[in-house]
Amino acid sequence: MGKTAIDVWEQIKLLESRGMVIKDKEKAQEVLLDAGYYRLGFYWFPFETTYPNKINRTHQFREGTNFDYIVKLYYFDFNLRSILMKYLNRIEIHFRTFLIYKVSNYYRTSPTWFADSTVVTAAYVRKFDQEVYTNRFKSISIIQQHHKTHINDKYAPAWKTLEYMTLGGIIHLFKALKDKMICRAISEHFKVRQLPVFESYLKTILTIRNYCAHGNVLYDIALPTSIRRGPAGQMESANYHLSLIHISEPTRLR
Protein backbone atom coordinates (compact mmCIF):
# COMPACT_ATOMS: atom_id res chain seq x y z
CA MET A 1 0.00 0.00 0.00
CA GLY A 2 2.94 2.34 0.42
CA LYS A 3 2.69 5.45 2.60
CA THR A 4 -0.48 6.91 1.12
CA ALA A 5 -3.84 5.96 2.63
CA ILE A 6 -6.37 4.52 0.19
CA ASP A 7 -10.05 3.79 0.68
CA VAL A 8 -11.52 0.32 0.92
CA TRP A 9 -12.51 0.08 -2.75
CA GLU A 10 -8.98 1.00 -3.77
CA GLN A 11 -7.72 -1.68 -1.38
CA ILE A 12 -9.91 -4.26 -3.13
CA LYS A 13 -8.63 -3.18 -6.54
CA LEU A 14 -5.05 -3.38 -5.29
CA LEU A 15 -5.55 -6.92 -4.01
CA GLU A 16 -7.10 -7.96 -7.30
CA SER A 17 -4.24 -6.41 -9.26
CA ARG A 18 -1.90 -8.62 -7.25
CA GLY A 19 -3.77 -11.77 -8.20
CA MET A 20 -6.30 -12.27 -5.40
CA VAL A 21 -9.73 -13.55 -6.38
CA ILE A 22 -12.50 -11.54 -4.71
CA LYS A 23 -15.94 -12.80 -5.69
CA ASP A 24 -18.08 -10.90 -3.16
CA LYS A 25 -16.76 -7.35 -3.09
CA GLU A 26 -19.45 -6.13 -0.68
CA LYS A 27 -18.42 -8.79 1.83
CA ALA A 28 -14.76 -7.96 1.23
CA GLN A 29 -15.51 -4.32 2.00
CA GLU A 30 -17.22 -5.34 5.24
CA VAL A 31 -14.29 -7.50 6.33
CA LEU A 32 -11.65 -4.92 5.41
CA LEU A 33 -13.47 -2.23 7.38
CA ASP A 34 -13.93 -4.59 10.32
CA ALA A 35 -10.47 -6.17 10.57
CA GLY A 36 -8.35 -3.73 8.59
CA TYR A 37 -6.12 -4.12 5.55
CA TYR A 38 -2.90 -4.16 7.56
CA ARG A 39 -4.08 -6.83 10.03
CA LEU A 40 -5.42 -9.05 7.26
CA GLY A 41 -2.00 -8.82 5.64
CA PHE A 42 -0.70 -11.22 8.29
CA TYR A 43 -3.21 -13.78 7.04
CA TRP A 44 -2.67 -13.43 3.32
CA PHE A 45 1.11 -13.36 3.61
CA PRO A 46 1.33 -17.21 3.41
CA PHE A 47 -0.49 -17.03 0.07
CA GLU A 48 2.10 -14.72 -1.50
CA THR A 49 4.53 -16.07 -4.09
CA THR A 50 7.57 -14.91 -2.11
CA TYR A 51 6.42 -16.41 1.22
CA PRO A 52 8.11 -16.82 3.71
CA ASN A 53 10.62 -14.20 2.55
CA LYS A 54 9.80 -10.88 4.23
CA ILE A 55 12.53 -8.96 2.42
CA ASN A 56 11.93 -7.85 -1.15
CA ARG A 57 8.33 -9.07 -1.06
CA THR A 58 6.53 -8.77 -4.38
CA HIS A 59 3.10 -8.90 -2.68
CA GLN A 60 1.90 -11.00 -5.61
CA PHE A 61 -0.43 -13.88 -4.75
CA ARG A 62 -0.19 -17.48 -5.85
CA GLU A 63 -2.58 -18.43 -8.59
CA GLY A 64 -6.07 -19.20 -7.32
CA THR A 65 -5.70 -17.33 -4.01
CA ASN A 66 -9.21 -16.48 -2.88
CA PHE A 67 -10.14 -13.75 -0.43
CA ASP A 68 -12.41 -16.29 1.25
CA TYR A 69 -9.32 -18.30 2.29
CA ILE A 70 -7.93 -15.28 4.11
CA VAL A 71 -11.23 -14.62 5.86
CA LYS A 72 -11.44 -18.26 7.02
CA LEU A 73 -7.88 -18.15 8.37
CA TYR A 74 -8.61 -14.85 10.12
CA TYR A 75 -11.68 -16.24 11.89
CA PHE A 76 -9.86 -19.47 12.71
CA ASP A 77 -7.24 -17.37 14.49
CA PHE A 78 -9.95 -15.30 16.19
CA ASN A 79 -11.71 -18.41 17.50
CA LEU A 80 -8.42 -20.01 18.55
CA ARG A 81 -7.61 -16.94 20.67
CA SER A 82 -11.05 -17.08 22.28
CA ILE A 83 -10.71 -20.76 23.17
CA LEU A 84 -7.20 -20.38 24.54
CA MET A 85 -8.09 -17.26 26.52
CA LYS A 86 -10.92 -19.09 28.24
CA TYR A 87 -8.59 -21.75 29.60
CA LEU A 88 -5.54 -19.55 30.13
CA ASN A 89 -7.64 -17.31 32.39
CA ARG A 90 -8.53 -20.34 34.49
CA ILE A 91 -4.88 -21.35 34.72
CA GLU A 92 -3.90 -17.80 35.68
CA ILE A 93 -6.50 -17.59 38.45
CA HIS A 94 -5.61 -21.00 39.85
CA PHE A 95 -1.87 -20.31 39.82
CA ARG A 96 -2.37 -16.97 41.57
CA THR A 97 -4.78 -18.44 44.12
CA PHE A 98 -2.59 -21.40 45.02
CA LEU A 99 0.56 -19.29 45.27
CA ILE A 100 -1.16 -16.85 47.64
CA TYR A 101 -2.62 -19.71 49.68
CA LYS A 102 0.60 -21.71 49.92
CA VAL A 103 2.97 -18.87 50.77
CA SER A 104 0.54 -17.05 53.08
CA ASN A 105 0.03 -20.20 55.13
CA TYR A 106 3.76 -20.86 55.25
CA TYR A 107 4.43 -17.32 56.54
CA ARG A 108 1.30 -16.87 58.64
CA THR A 109 2.81 -14.12 60.78
CA SER A 110 3.73 -12.08 57.69
CA PRO A 111 0.54 -11.25 55.75
CA THR A 112 2.56 -8.90 53.55
CA TRP A 113 5.26 -11.46 52.81
CA PHE A 114 5.50 -10.19 49.21
CA ALA A 115 7.28 -7.11 50.61
CA ASP A 116 9.37 -8.99 53.19
CA SER A 117 13.03 -9.26 52.21
CA THR A 118 13.39 -12.44 54.26
CA VAL A 119 10.80 -14.09 52.00
CA VAL A 120 11.54 -12.54 48.61
CA THR A 121 14.64 -10.89 47.19
CA ALA A 122 15.46 -7.34 48.26
CA ALA A 123 15.52 -6.26 44.63
CA TYR A 124 11.94 -7.47 44.23
CA VAL A 125 10.80 -5.59 47.34
CA ARG A 126 12.31 -2.33 46.09
CA LYS A 127 10.78 -2.67 42.66
CA PHE A 128 7.40 -3.70 44.05
CA ASP A 129 7.23 -0.74 46.43
CA GLN A 130 8.27 1.86 43.86
CA GLU A 131 6.79 0.61 40.60
CA VAL A 132 3.83 -1.54 41.56
CA TYR A 133 2.19 -0.69 44.87
CA THR A 134 2.70 3.07 44.98
CA ASN A 135 2.14 3.76 41.29
CA ARG A 136 -0.69 1.32 40.52
CA PHE A 137 -2.23 -0.59 43.38
CA LYS A 138 -2.96 2.37 45.65
CA SER A 139 -5.43 3.68 43.07
CA ILE A 140 -7.57 0.51 43.39
CA SER A 141 -10.66 1.22 45.49
CA ILE A 142 -10.43 -1.92 47.64
CA ILE A 143 -6.79 -1.18 48.45
CA GLN A 144 -7.68 2.44 49.23
CA GLN A 145 -10.47 1.28 51.54
CA HIS A 146 -8.08 -1.05 53.33
CA HIS A 147 -5.72 1.82 54.10
CA LYS A 148 -8.59 3.99 55.33
CA THR A 149 -9.60 1.23 57.73
CA HIS A 150 -6.07 0.17 58.68
CA ILE A 151 -4.19 3.46 58.58
CA ASN A 152 -0.98 2.01 60.01
CA ASP A 153 -0.60 -0.70 57.38
CA LYS A 154 2.02 -0.02 54.74
CA TYR A 155 0.49 -2.68 52.49
CA ALA A 156 -2.76 -4.58 52.27
CA PRO A 157 -2.36 -8.32 52.93
CA ALA A 158 -1.35 -10.69 50.16
CA TRP A 159 -4.85 -12.07 49.54
CA LYS A 160 -6.03 -8.53 48.72
CA THR A 161 -2.98 -7.04 47.06
CA LEU A 162 -1.96 -9.90 44.81
CA GLU A 163 -5.47 -10.37 43.46
CA TYR A 164 -4.81 -7.30 41.31
CA MET A 165 -1.42 -8.42 40.05
CA THR A 166 -1.01 -9.45 36.42
CA LEU A 167 0.06 -12.95 35.46
CA GLY A 168 3.49 -11.59 34.56
CA GLY A 169 3.69 -9.96 37.99
CA ILE A 170 2.70 -13.17 39.76
CA ILE A 171 5.31 -15.16 37.83
CA HIS A 172 7.94 -12.55 38.71
CA LEU A 173 6.95 -12.84 42.38
CA PHE A 174 7.10 -16.64 42.20
CA LYS A 175 10.65 -16.52 40.86
CA ALA A 176 11.64 -13.98 43.54
CA LEU A 177 10.75 -16.34 46.40
CA LYS A 178 13.90 -17.21 48.32
CA ASP A 179 12.75 -20.58 49.62
CA LYS A 180 12.81 -22.79 46.55
CA MET A 181 11.19 -25.59 48.53
CA ILE A 182 7.99 -23.55 48.40
CA CYS A 183 8.43 -23.05 44.67
CA ARG A 184 8.87 -26.79 44.20
CA ALA A 185 5.78 -27.48 46.30
CA ILE A 186 3.78 -25.19 44.03
CA SER A 187 5.31 -26.80 40.96
CA GLU A 188 4.47 -30.28 42.23
CA HIS A 189 0.91 -29.17 42.94
CA PHE A 190 0.64 -28.82 39.16
CA LYS A 191 2.33 -32.23 38.82
CA VAL A 192 5.60 -30.93 37.42
CA ARG A 193 8.59 -32.24 39.36
CA GLN A 194 11.32 -30.10 37.86
CA LEU A 195 11.19 -26.41 38.77
CA PRO A 196 13.03 -25.15 35.64
CA VAL A 197 10.52 -27.03 33.48
CA PHE A 198 7.62 -25.51 35.41
CA GLU A 199 9.09 -22.03 34.98
CA SER A 200 9.44 -22.61 31.24
CA TYR A 201 5.77 -23.58 31.12
CA LEU A 202 4.84 -20.39 32.96
CA LYS A 203 6.86 -18.32 30.51
CA THR A 204 5.15 -19.98 27.56
CA ILE A 205 1.71 -19.57 29.11
CA LEU A 206 2.43 -15.88 29.72
CA THR A 207 3.58 -15.35 26.13
CA ILE A 208 0.51 -17.01 24.64
CA ARG A 209 -1.80 -15.30 27.13
CA ASN A 210 -0.43 -11.88 26.18
CA TYR A 211 -0.77 -12.69 22.48
CA CYS A 212 -4.41 -13.57 23.06
CA ALA A 213 -5.15 -10.57 25.29
CA HIS A 214 -3.69 -8.08 22.81
CA GLY A 215 -5.31 -9.67 19.77
CA ASN A 216 -2.00 -10.63 18.19
CA VAL A 217 -1.79 -13.08 15.31
CA LEU A 218 -1.65 -16.53 16.86
CA TYR A 219 -1.76 -19.19 14.15
CA ASP A 220 1.95 -18.82 13.29
CA ILE A 221 3.25 -17.73 16.70
CA ALA A 222 6.99 -18.25 17.18
CA LEU A 223 7.71 -18.81 20.86
CA PRO A 224 10.94 -17.22 22.13
CA THR A 225 11.84 -20.40 23.99
CA SER A 226 10.83 -23.99 23.45
CA ILE A 227 9.01 -26.10 26.01
CA ARG A 228 9.80 -29.67 26.87
CA ARG A 229 7.77 -32.28 25.04
CA GLY A 230 6.56 -35.39 26.80
CA PRO A 231 6.53 -36.00 30.57
CA ALA A 232 7.52 -33.04 32.68
CA GLY A 233 7.44 -35.12 35.80
CA GLN A 234 4.27 -36.90 34.82
CA MET A 235 3.05 -37.75 38.26
CA GLU A 236 -0.46 -38.19 36.91
CA SER A 237 -2.24 -38.40 33.57
CA ALA A 238 -3.17 -35.40 31.45
CA ASN A 239 -6.75 -35.73 32.70
CA TYR A 240 -5.48 -34.92 36.18
CA HIS A 241 -4.22 -31.53 35.04
CA LEU A 242 -7.64 -30.68 33.63
CA SER A 243 -9.47 -31.75 36.77
CA LEU A 244 -6.96 -29.95 38.96
CA ILE A 245 -7.79 -26.55 37.52
CA HIS A 246 -11.43 -27.47 36.85
CA ILE A 247 -11.42 -26.54 33.18
CA SER A 248 -13.01 -29.65 31.78
CA GLU A 249 -16.45 -29.08 30.31
CA PRO A 250 -19.38 -30.13 32.53
CA THR A 251 -20.74 -33.56 31.81
CA ARG A 252 -24.08 -33.46 30.05
CA LEU A 253 -27.01 -35.01 31.84
CA ARG A 254 -28.19 -38.15 30.14
What are these regions (language model features)?
Residues 2-197, 219-220:
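Short, contiguous, well-structured surface segments enriched in hydrophobic/aromatic residues
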Residues 199, 237-243:
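Extended, compositionally biased non-globular segments
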Residues 200-224:
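Histidine-centered, metal-coordinating catalytic motifs and their short helical/loop contexts
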Residues 224-238:
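Short, charged amphipathic alpha-helical segments flanked by flexible coils
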Residues 245-254:
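Single conserved hydrophobic/aromatic residue that forms the stacking wall/gate
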